[in-house]
Amino acid sequence: ADLKDVDVAYVLNLINFHSVDFTGKASGKAIIKSLFNDPDAYAQLDVKEFTFENGPLGVLHAGVNFNKELEQIDIHAVADDGPEHQTLINGYVSPKRNYIDLGIDAQGTSMKFLENFCGSFMNQVEAWGNGYLNVVGDLKNINLVGDITAHGKVHLKQLNTDYTFDALHAHAIPDDILIENDTIFDRNRNIAILSGGIHHKHLTRLSYDLDIKAHNFLGFDTREFGDNTFYGTIYATGEVGIHGKSGETVIDINAEPEPGSLLE
């Protein structure tokens, strides 16, 4: 069958795959044969506007085939978001065993999908990662393991600050994504040390505990009251904890303001 702009989310809904969200418009050729109870199926697809958890990853070029011997769907794909932004995906999904194992080789992969997980305190993610991750586990208890190193910037909503990082290392283990003593920078390239983790239950019910040790670091920068009773710019030395879950963020500050700070 020739496919033209088929909604990927619709297809995943048909096979009851809701572990993580993929979207896009798939075109290409799919062949399904069943001779004397000997099923065979394969497809060569191009998926435009391919996204993972609302994060754009470019155009996905995917070869998919039914592995009769192992009774699983083998997937070999590349998400092409430009010459320096490639994501290689190789692995399988087994509906019979209710299991997934997808290896993800990130080569300048966009980290925009983090907004879907950390949107209660973070947005405007402009970051890219390199490393290797596995999406693996029972389809109802999916997990993420591996390591990735990222560069770019994020915006912390409650603080109204942009922070950049040159080589932030994240280590994913079951139900946790860990960061240990990594350097982040404010707009003046002042340094703070970030540690902590993003916790999840099979990539759902996310929560987070992040700790920042700062020296003369931009910790708050607003130009109007908004929801606060104050506004201003604060450079601080000390410690900041960011804790929370979806829809709820608590920021604990134990820091001294530095010269140049202004609060109205």
Where do the PLM segments sit?
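Interface amphipathic segments
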Residues: A1-Y132, K140-E239, H243-E264
